[in-house]
Amino acid sequence: MDFFMNMDPPTVTAQEHKVTMVGGRPHFYDPAPVKDARKQLTAHLLPHKPKEPFIGAVALSAVWLFPKGKRHKHGEWRVTKPDTDNLQKLLKDCMTKCGFWKDDAQVVRETVEKRWSDEPAGIYIEITDLEV
């Protein structure tokens, strides 16, 4: 399956947890921008949710297309933050929550790209069932 989510991709990542002490113990939480990014990704993913979650091994390909502005060319690699592994973690967490698969450990092969783009910006996703 493949689909395109027409959106400004989030630039905050799942690794941006905050910590506070509660009763002498550390309590980790997501700051508001991370919560907003999760909501945005989830809202764009839900219309593409498969009828049944993938079972077994899958390959995930994601192309993150960020609005290029005036300083970059269409298709140019985005070599600035956020890192691809951090972007993917947030995306896979949201895909798991939406029911694309039971556990993101099922993703055994990944391809990730970050590019600057003319409109539309967004995220192109392709999921391949490797069990077939």
PLM regions: where:
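Acidic, proline/glycine-enriched N-terminal capping motif
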Residues: 1-132
